[in-house]
Amino acid sequence: ASDVYKRQDYTSTTSPGDTTYYVSFNSGNDENDGKSEDKPFKNLGKINSITFNPGDIIKFKSGESWKGYFKLRGSGSEDKPISIENYSSGNKPIIDGDGYQAAVFIENMEYVNISGLELTNQASHKFTNGSVKLMDQSSRTGLDLRFGLLVLRHGSGNIRNININDIKISDIYPTPNNSDNNHQGYGIRFESLNDDNVLNYYNGIQMENLDILNTGHYGIHIVNRMSGAQADYYHRNIVIKNSKFTDNGGSGIVLARCKDVVVENSEFKGSGSGKDSRMWNRGSSLWTYTCN
């Protein structure tokens, strides 16, 4: 697996769109153009430095692994989403968040498809020299909160069509100073924030063929942080299907301020697990509150 590389180590560029990029840690080079299997990029920092556009596809090579975080930039369109996939044969490519708050971070983006990856994240939130690992020099750390995939919305406007398929997520735990926060590890979280009471919501979340196991808290958490938000601002049109939730320290799925939700053909085993001392050790298979 790679060392941690950040986008600040690279010159920022913008993709023209409708372009496929390949990433291989074992055979790649960040001096390549990344546009063929023969000349792939190498590091997460390189693709973190690119702003993608509609029709772009980012492909990670199967059987390989990276340490650090992948923060996707740019948005797709209704007819041309941005897609994250794998290529070649073998096991799913692994992104190990290595103590950053999230292995994959999507912020204020829409029309995105993610498939065919494996995510994990339980290493220390500090480098060996004691400095804290920060995503893009933000205040977000993996100290008290940790995610496999974090999808975040703040500011005005709604987010449409985020599709997640065939993803494995396991071993998501923070490294807090206070052991009371040991359990704050989540497989996937969709979250909208209350910025000066500007209301927003997700419209169109589809997740299928997921395998989420060994998280400190919830497997999937979809939440709207708007204080007093009415049902007009609930997240909506959410489908979760054909998925497995195993030994999550809290509930398998938790939905808050959501409506028009379908959960089907999914399996829950060991919800509320305490088999690891970092787990919450309390939870149900599926829990909803303040939902329609």
Per-region residue spans from a language model:
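Short, small-residue-biased leader/transition segments that mark boundaries at the very start
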Residues: A1-Y5
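Right-handed parallel beta-helix/beta-solenoid
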Residues: K6-K46, S62-E64, Y87
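Loop/turn elements at helix/coil->beta-strand transitions in domains of secreted/extracellular proteins
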Residues: G17-T19, N53-I57
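Extracellular beta-strand-rich solenoid/capping regions of secreted or surface-exposed proteins
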Residues: G45, S49-P54, S65-S83, K92-R160, ...
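Extracellular beta-strand repeat scaffolds in secreted/surface proteins
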Residues: D56-F60, E85
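Short, well-ordered beta-to-alpha junction loops that form the rim of enzyme active sites
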Residues: K61-E64, I222-V223, L255-R257
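Right-handed parallel beta-helix
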Residues: P81, E85-G90, E110-N121, G157-Y173, ...
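Short, flexible helix-coil linker/hinge segments at the edges of structured domains or between repeats
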Residues: N178-G185, G272, D276-N281
